[in-house]
A protein has these predicted regions:
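Bacterial N-terminal signal peptides that target proteins for export
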Residues: 2-12
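First exposed extracellular module after export/assembly in secreted or surface-exposed proteins
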Residues: 36-172
Length: 172
């Protein structure tokens, strides 16, 4: 007989460890499509002392089955080169509400952004979370109502679903 652990304590410890193993091995990892999916969270306007918004924060949820969302700073060769369609992996299109409805306004530089690699330590693993991107607004817009369309690309160039914000009124 072991003088530090009586037999009954060893059996209880062994049964506890086996029980913990069984319970944790039964937990299923969430499975998502390898094509990224996004869902709206919110759009927040930030005003300074003037009557028009100076910044907006676009926030949305995302999920991806193989976790390949994000670009490294060195990802600048094709297909991620500046002249290509995949330089920005968060694509944001800007629309102004004009007399005849919404019209897209192409900006230079665009509101689009490069999301950094989100899952560097666990490549190939399911990932989900939310992204918030701060956008600098025109302090003297020609039209006071706008909206955005946005989507993301993963590293495999899979395009997520496209979302549209509700009308955003820039004036207080």
């Amino acid at each position: 007989m072991n003088r530090y652990f009586p037999k009954t304590q060893i059996w209880v410890l062994a049964a506890t460890l086996i029980g913990i193993y069984i319970l944790t091995s039964c937990v299923k990892q969430e499975e998502f499509s390898d094509i990224p999916e996004i869902s709206a969270r919110q759009f927040t306007l930030i005003f300074d002392t003037g009557q028009y918004a100076v910044r907006g924060i676009l926030a949305f949820n995302f999920q991806d089955g193989d976790g390949d969302i994000g670009l490294n700073p060195g990802d600048t060769f094709a297909p991620y080169n500046r002249a290509g369609n995949y330089y920005y992996n968060l694509v944001i299109r800007y629309f102004e509400k004009q007399d005849s409805g919404y019209a897209e306004v192409v900006l230079d530089p665009p509101f689009s952004a490069r999301i950094p690699v989100l899952n560097p330590d666990y490549p190939g693993k399911t990932i989900r979370g939310y992204i918030a991107d701060t956008l600098t607004m025109d302090p003297t817009p020609s039209f006071d109502t706008i909206r955005f369309e946005y989507f993301i690309y993963d590293r495999a160039l899979s395009k997520s679903n496209v979302l549209t914000t509700p009308d955003i009124v820039l004036k207080r």
